[in-house]
Amino acid sequence: MNKEELFDVTVIGGGPAGLYSAFYSGLREMKTKIIEFQPHLGGKIHVYPEKMIWDIGGLPPITGAKLIEQLVEQGLTFQPEVVLNEKVESITRDEYGTFLLTTSSGQQHFSKTVIIATGSGILKPQKLAIEGAERFEVSNLNYTVKSLKHFKDKTVIVSGGGNSAIDWANELEPLAKKVYVTYRKEALSGHEAQITQLLNSSVTCLLNTSITKLIAGENHEAIERVELTNHETGEISYLSIDEVIINHGYERDMTLLENSELNIEMIDNYFIAGNANSESSIPGLYAAGDILKHDGKLHLIAGAFHDAGNAVNKAKQFIQPDASEYGMVSSHNDVFKKRNRELMKQMIE
């Protein structure tokens, strides 16, 4: 890759904040690139494809999978260059002020500005710490719920006591034959309303209890029973199950910010310290979505869109100081005239 391939803005991360950054930068006629570690765009929403999302203004309840589909379609409106399966490991800057992004495969990407939209970082589920557990990942040991129907009429045990574990248990309760939740602590730690729903349902909660062994059936391919250990009494019990779901949180890979030669101001050694305009401590480098922290920050998908728009506006003015502070609203923008005519035609046919 040569330096002639210089982009106006490079967005690191292809989740909601990154995709909206790509859309809005295209709207502002900026040459845009997205670099995403995963083999697909959409970000963390892939973890909960069938969950209903209610808190995006103007949208009725929508599944995670459908939202990803719409976000990707919008994000690619202006045909940004998309680089998948590449992990950005460092950001440097040359004597001319150009950002150099280096990936784990050795690729180099050059950009006038950068928007970091890595969300919670590169997430990897914390695996069940039991020897040999990995062999059941192809059968009935799950680290996410991709399809609720898969668990219909089955006996399911969910290990974990945080928001995701409780949400999954609540979602599965009306579908599954029986749902158990096991948690190593004495009290669940999710949102109050979700905990109340769980405790008032048919789900059986096993607190102060952990899965300590996975026992295969005769074919040795799937888990047939789990061994449970109560941490208060030491009592060991066994439970016959069809599916095991593990939600013990995620490991965050923060290599990008740890390896950066730029002195990016951080909060709690994780968040990028910024302001309401999505500016970081480095001129020309912006942040959007969950990675950004400042007073008044809204930690919702809707807030990520707001961050993205602000980041793009500041990036545009950084490159072109006499540019308008804000992009033109879509209802008056010439770039949508042809597409609007097509949509109107479809509406009246």
Swiss-Prot record:
EC number, as in UniProt: 1.18.1.2
Keyword Transit peptide annotated: no
A Pfam family that the UniProt record links to this protein: Pyr_redox_2
Cofactor note (record): Binds 1 FAD per subunit.
Catalytic activities: 2 reduced [2Fe-2S]-[ferredoxin] + NADP(+) + H(+) = 2 oxidized [2Fe-2S]-[ferredoxin] + NADPH
Record-linked InterPro entries: FAD/NAD-bd_sf (IPR036188), FAD/NAD-binding_dom (IPR023753), Fd--NADP_Rdtase_type_2 (IPR022890), Ferredoxin-NADP_redctase_2 (IPR050097)
Chain residues that bind FAD: 36, 44, 48, 88, 123, 290, 331
GO molecular function, one term: NADP binding
Cofactor section: FAD
Record keyword Chloroplast present: no
Protein family: Belongs to the ferredoxin--NADP reductase type 2 family.
Subunit structure: Homodimer.
Protein name per the record: Ferredoxin--NADP reductase 1
Organism name: Bacillus cytotoxicus (strain DSM 22905 / CIP 110041 / 391-98 / NVH 391-98)
